[in-house]
Regions:
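Cyclic-nucleotide recognition modules
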Residues: 90-145
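Glycine- and acidic-residue-biased ligand/ion/polar-headgroup-sensing regions
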Residues: 57, 68, 72-79, 96-97
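Short beta-strand segments in beta-sandwich/barrel cores
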Residues: 50, 59, 77-82, 99, ...
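Short phosphate-coordinating micro-motif centered on Lys-Gly-acidic
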Residues: 60-65
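Cyclic nucleotide-binding regulatory module and flanking cytosolic helices
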Residues: 18-50, 105
């Protein structure tokens, strides 16, 4: 059991749900720096996104696979890299507050050319690109972002 305040008790699952909501609020605060968040955008972040803590060295996306997820880095660091002639080549790093995805899969419907891994313990919020497209079809604000 976790203690929240003097008299409120939450289970571990309830505590995790609260942390997810806090993380989604952080994303919404970042988005609000650029656009006015409408009800559909807010609903999207609460219902369609998932926040997870991921240990160092875990692959979020693998080269030569289809991956249509978008990754929001809440805490930690991601590395995008690929293998060429047996060599591990880093193409980019994504720190807190950054967004990444395998754009070759999302926009060209091709196998991913890159791997995405956590290079430290990270809190990542993900959403499926198809769900984001659905949001843009009902929210003019999101579509114009």
């Amino acid at each position: 059991m976790f203690v929240w305040g003097a008299s409120e008790f939450f289970s571990e699952r309830s505590f995790f749900v609260i942390l997810q909501k806090i993380n989604r609020m952080r994303i919404l605060q970042e988005v609000e720096k650029h656009i006015k968040v409408d009800a559909e955008i807010e609903r999207f972040f609460y219902e369609e996104c998932e926040t997870r803590t991921i240990e160092k060295g875990k692959l979020l996306s693998e080269q030569n696979h289809y991956n249509r997820n978008i990754y929001f880095v809440e805490e930690g660091m991601l590395r995008m890299f690929y293998y060429e002639n047996g060599k591990d080549i880093t193409s980019n790093f994504y720190s807190e507050g950054k967004i990444t995805a395998n754009i070759d899969t999302i926009f060209k419907n091709e196998l991913s050319k890159n791997n995405i891994e956590t290079i430290e313990k990270s809190i990542i919020t993900t959403c499926n690109y198809h769900k984001l497209e659905e949001l843009c079809s009902v929210s003019l604000t999101a579509a114009n972002f």
